[in-house]
C-alpha cells in the first residue's frame, strides 16, 4: 500500500470590506468563489494558489485578516 504524507495545510482568513455593486462580473465571481457575499463576512480558506489568485483579483474588496 502507498501511504499518503499528511500535510498540514496553511489556513487564511479573509474578510469582505467592499461591495461588489457596479464591479465587473469577473470580480463578483471571484468573491462568490471565495464564499463571500455580504459586507464584513469572514471565511476561513486553505492557502492555495487558486485562493491567492482570487484574492489578487479582488484585493480592493477583501482584507486578509490572518495567515496561519
Swiss-Prot record:
GO biological process, one term: translation
GO molecular function: structural constituent of ribosome
InterPro entries hit by this protein: Ribo_uL30_ferredoxin-like_sf, Ribosomal_uL30_bac-type, Ribosomal_uL30_CS, Ribosomal_uL30_ferredoxin-like
UniProt keyword DNA-binding present: no
PROSITE patterns for this protein: RIBOSOMAL_L30
Keyword Transcription regulation attributed: no
Record GO cellular component, one term: large ribosomal subunit
Gene3D superfamilies: Ribosomal protein L30, ferredoxin-like fold domain (3.30.1390.20)
Record keywords: Ribonucleoprotein, Ribosomal protein
Residue ranges of coiled coil: none
Pfam families the UniProt entry points to: Ribosomal_L30
Binding partners and assembly: Part of the 50S ribosomal subunit.
Entry similarity comment: Belongs to the universal ribosomal protein uL30 family.
Protein's UniProt name: Large ribosomal subunit protein uL30
Amino acid at each position: 500500500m502507498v501511504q499518503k504524507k499528511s500535510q498540514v495545510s496553511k489556513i487564511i482568513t479573509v474578510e469582505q470590506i467592499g461591495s461588489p455593486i457596479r464591479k465587473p462580473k469577473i470580480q463578483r465571481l471571484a468573491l462568490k468563489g471565495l464564499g463571500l457575499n455580504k459586507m464584513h463576512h469572514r471565511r476561513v480558506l486553505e492557502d492555495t494558489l487558486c485562493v491567492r489568485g482570487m484574492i489578487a483579483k479582488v484585493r480592493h474588496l477583501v482584507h486578509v485578516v490572518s495567515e496561519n
